[in-house]
């Protein structure tokens, strides 16, 4: 019997994701928040003449391109990691717990292929969810405040087309720490056989890392904490572009993602699924 390709196995995984409620819950969280944000700012503008008294919202009405940047600032700490983990934490645990992994492994598919397909499906879901959030935020912002020039974090005014490219780049770069969080979720999903434990556990890890940053005396390790990397995309929105935090974040995130995926593979390789 011919062994199916990893891409074929990944298509199986994507079909399963389409039938699961948590798939749509995660995307819904990522998409609804920008709409609520834009609605709130429109109401604020209508009743109070805008948000000039707020450091984050002072320029929001100047250009709709400020909206996806501001929503990324707010969503990056919790909502977007939660979106990624709702699937990553479930991707192995549910089938393992239900005893259906052994059915997949009897289709002449080796374990490495199965895990690679699951990681690929979780990664694709994370990418699609993130850019759906970006698209909704951009469209809603532009519809409310126009496709105008935008002010960078350095105070430099850039044209609307360049501003749009910077927004895309910012979201693209945020994928690096987000995929690292996803990798931790896959690892815990593989270890625990319990979706809730994997999701809560991975969120707990990120929460602990975030809390470490506010503990006095931890400044020397803060540059190496995953949650610190959530904000390093800010360097793309400065003039000139500050590449130092970008490259630093890339290799720091790799230190979290690569060992997590290797450990997940080793655990999955040795997992006894014969009894369910």
Predicted regions and their residues:
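Alpha-helical transmembrane segments of multi-pass membrane transporters/translocases
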Residues: 2-3, 7, 237-276
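Transmembrane helix segments
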Residues: 36-46, 164, 192-227
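Hydrophobic/aromatic residues in alpha-helical transmembrane segments
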Residues: 84-88, 101, 136, 184, ...
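Transmembrane helix boundary and interhelical loop/hinge segments in multi-pass membrane proteins
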Residues: 85-105, 111, 119, 273
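Alpha-helix N-cap/helix-start motif at helix boundaries, enriched for small hydrophobics
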Residues: 113-115, 268
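Aromatic- and glycine-rich beta-strand/loop motifs that create alpha-glucan
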Residues: 1-31
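Secretory targeting signals
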Residues: 31-86, 116-182, 186, 233-252
């Amino acid at each position: 019997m011919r062994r199916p390709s990893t891409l074929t196995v990944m298509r199986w995984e994507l079909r399963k994701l389409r039938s699961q409620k948590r798939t749509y819950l995660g995307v819904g969280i990522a998409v609804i928040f920008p709409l609520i944000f834009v609605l709130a700012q429109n109401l604020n503008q209508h009743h109070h003449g805008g948000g000039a008294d707020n450091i984050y919202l002072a320029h929001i009405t100047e250009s709709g391109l400020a909206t996806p940047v501001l929503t990324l600032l707010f969503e990056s700490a919790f909502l977007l990691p939660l979106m990624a983990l709702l699937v990553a934490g479930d991707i192995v645990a549910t089938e393992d717990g239900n005893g259906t992994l052994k059915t997949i492994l009897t289709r002449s598919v080796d374990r490495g292929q199965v895990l690679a397909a699951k990681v690929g499906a979780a990664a694709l879901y994370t990418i699609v969810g993130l850019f759906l959030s970006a698209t909704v935020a951009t469209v809603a912002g532009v519809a409310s405040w126009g496709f105008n020039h935008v002010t960078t974090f350095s105070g430099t005014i850039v044209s609307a087309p360049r501003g749009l490219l910077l927004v895309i780049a910012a979201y693209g770069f945020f994928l690096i720490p987000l995929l690292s969080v996803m990798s931790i979720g896959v690892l815990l999903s593989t270890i625990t056989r319990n979706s809730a434990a994997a999701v809560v556990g991975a969120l707990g890890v990120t929460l602990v890392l975030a809390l470490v940053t506010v503990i006095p005396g931890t400044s020397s390790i803060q540059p190496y904490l995953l949650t610190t990397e959530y904000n390093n995309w800010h360097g793309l929105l400065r003039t000139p572009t500050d590449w130092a935090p970008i490259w630093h974040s890339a290799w720091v995130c790799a230190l979290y993602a690569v060992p997590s995926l290797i450990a997940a593979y080793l655990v999955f390789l040795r997992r006894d699924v014969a009894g369910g």
